[in-house]
């Protein structure tokens, strides 16, 4: 992905002409913002059509003020997305694959439920309902494993958030994918650890 700038131009007169950025299906263009008369875009793809010379199309670097605005906006988007993991008690998108071999809700409500079960189970076993609503007969030790994995997943989500934030803060405004990239958080799959041991 690369940063480009151009200056749209409209000529006056009875048959005025507007010169602007030419697009095609082979490239993805995201408008990043404007500074003075220039429009800054991020373009993904190499098959950029020839542009009218009147628009002064060129590879460019974002001006510092526009870069700062974009960084602030992206950090706010990241924070809002990450708060879904903390602020929403029930989050159906937040699940892990446990080392016990099944999917488990890992949101705050599920963690609280696990803590409650661990507190009252004693030496008995209990039915635990997984992410797919399948019952599993589990011991206290197995419930503790699930809780530990849910908490570890939460730590991993924060590490992913901080990595995105560091990349945004370190963006230079030249060829920074993170200025337009979608934030994707990956939930943990603890079943892989069993296979790799």
Language model feature labels by segment:
Residues 2-3, 9-35, 44-197:
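A preference for well-ordered globular domain cores
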């Amino acid at each position: 992905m690369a940063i480009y700038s151009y200056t749209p131009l409209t000529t006056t007169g009875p048959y005025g002409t507007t010169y602007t950025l030419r697009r095609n299906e082979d490239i993805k263009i995201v408008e990043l913002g404007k500074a003075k008369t220039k429009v800054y875009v991020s373009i993904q793809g190499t098959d950029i059509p020839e542009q009218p010379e009147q628009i002064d199309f060129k590879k460019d670097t974002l001006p510092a003020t526009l870069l700062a605005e974009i960084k602030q906006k992206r950090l706010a988007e990241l924070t809002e997305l990450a708060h879904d993991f903390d602020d929403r008690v029930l989050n159906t998108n937040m699940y892990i694959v446990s080392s016990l071999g099944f999917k488990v809700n890992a949101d705050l409500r599920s963690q609280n439920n696990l803590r409650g079960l661990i507190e009252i189970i004693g030496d008995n076993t209990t039915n635990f309902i997984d992410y797919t609503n399948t019952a599993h007969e589990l011991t206290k030790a197995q419930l503790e494993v699930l809780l530990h994995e849910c908490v570890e997943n939460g730590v991993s989500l924060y590490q992913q958030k901080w990595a995105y934030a560091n990349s945004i803060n370190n963006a230079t405004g030249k060829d920074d994918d993170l200025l337009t990239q979608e934030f994707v958080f990956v939930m943990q799959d603890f079943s892989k650890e069993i296979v790799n041991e």
